[in-house]
Amino acid sequence: MGRSPCCEKAHTNKGAWTKEEDDRLVAYIRAHGEGCWRSLPKAAGLLRCGKSCRLRWINYLRPDLKRGNFTEEEDELIIKLHSLLGNKWSLIAGRLPGRTDNEIKNYWNTHIRRKLLSRGIDPTTHRSINDGTASQDQVTTISFSNANSKEEDTKHKVAVDIMIKEENSPVQERCPDLNLDLKISPPCQQQINYHQENLKTGGRNGSSTLCFVCRLGIQNSKDCSCSDGVGN
């Protein structure tokens, strides 16, 4: 079950307050205090809801309210408090005795905002409008600079990766591997035929002929059959 309304809408007055209603509300509060706003209208003989009585008392009828226009000192104090607190009008009103939050809010929107704009100050940030434009341009320039720097870093990283890959990859040799294994094997058929031919001619070609054993690299062998006796 929800909370019951503060008053019956069918039995309450709406609209502007009359002087008679103001006098009744002031007389009751002076005699009994504020008390409970929900029960105050009926006790004071008013056909108003509790919320309407409370706002009427706080904003218009309480004796400590300051009447008249805001002073220059109050304007500067409101500007300073707004730069610190923002749109917290109740807290700002607590620093200005005799002024209500609703009164200060209306005065801000109708007067102080225009005053700040005429000074070239942003009412929201309390900074110079020109400084805000310059700051935005500076941020844009910095963002382009960062983009160029990132692009250069990317190119440098790619180049370094390529160099590292080339260093780690095996170098292909220009010449094939040479088989240096030496083996003693029978001579091919061409060498045998050549040796037999020399034996038949008896080395008459006019040049010294080595036998088969000497051709194998065996020096001073008893099996040497060179015609000039080189092996011996």
From Swiss-Prot:
SUPFAM superfamilies: Homeodomain-like (SSF46689). Its main location: nucleus. GO terms for cellular component: nucleus. Residues 9-61, 62-116 form the HTH myb-type domain. It is found in: Nucleus. Residues 37-61, 89-112 bind DNA. Keywords: DNA-binding, Nucleus, Repeat, Transcription, Transcription regulation. Expressed in roots, stems, leaves, seed pods and flowers. It comes from the Eukaryota. One of its GO terms (molecular function) is DNA binding. Transcription factor. PANTHER family: F14D16.11-RELATED. This is Myb-related protein 308. The lineage of its organism: Eukaryota, Viridiplantae, Streptophyta, Embryophyta, Tracheophyta. The gene is MYB308.
